[in-house]
């Protein structure tokens, strides 16, 4: 839908797309909202019941999925990057900053880059982790940068100026400020007139694949 296939083929990159949440469970309220439960697992390990039974997407992306890919496909998992959109962008930034030796390149489209500060993130973190905000910090890209986590290469972020979630839910300037203060290289581009949709993603997709290819093939 985002039109990545041609760019993946051009650069010789395999693309692995994990789901937003685990499947097969049926907890009360799990399927009610697009921004929680089966619509948005936020790539963390839940600690609150009942979510802690299966909502362990952090471990899945960190451990199980890379191992499965390595076993089943002829790819070099030592040269891996990570990227995503919106909540997936949150996951990409968070995972990439926590495990820079595993994910050498990072990019995101309209990410939730400071989830502890916005309604989407507060709802998810409270629901999955509880109200103690200290437990949120390890899953918040903005807090991770402030705590000293780094990506050795420049992070690329694209954000649409007409995104309806820009001011309430995304607030990229918060993450930008933390990166400046911490010395984390970041290219954050505000794209005039674009919204939160796949048209925005497909327009910028080529640049993101070039970003990852340059780093993963040793050209940067």
Segments (PLM) and residue ranges:
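Non-catalytic cap/lid and distal C-terminal segments of serine-dependent acyl enzymes
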Residues: 1-220
């Amino acid at each position: 839908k985002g039109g990545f296939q041609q760019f993946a083929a051009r650069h010789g990159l395999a693309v692995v797309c994990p789901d937003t949440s685990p499947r097969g469970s049926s907890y009360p309220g799990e399927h009610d909202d697009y921004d929680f439960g089966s619509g948005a697992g936020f790539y963390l390990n839940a600690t609150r019941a009942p979510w802690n039974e299966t909502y362990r997407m952090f471990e899945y992306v960190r451990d199980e999925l890379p191992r499965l890919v390595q076993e089943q496909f002829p790819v070099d998992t030592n040269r891996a990057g990570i990227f995503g959109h919106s909540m997936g962008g949150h996951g990409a930034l968070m995972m990439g900053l926590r495990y820079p030796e595993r994910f050498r390149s990072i990019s995101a489209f309209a990410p939730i880059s400071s989830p502890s500060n916005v309604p989407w993130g507060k709802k998810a973190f409270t629901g999955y982790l509880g109200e103690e905000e200290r437990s949120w910090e390890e899953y918040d890209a903005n807090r991770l940068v402030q705590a000293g986590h780094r990506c050795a290469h420049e992070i690329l972020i694209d954000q649409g100026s007409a995104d309806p979630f820009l001011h309430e839910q995304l607030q990229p300037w918060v993450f930008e400020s933390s990166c400046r203060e911490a010395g984390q290289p970041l290219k954050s581009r505000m794209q005039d007139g674009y919204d939160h949709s796949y048209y925005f993603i497909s327009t910028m997709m080529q640049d993101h694949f070039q970003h990852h290819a340059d780093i993963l093939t040793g050209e940067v």
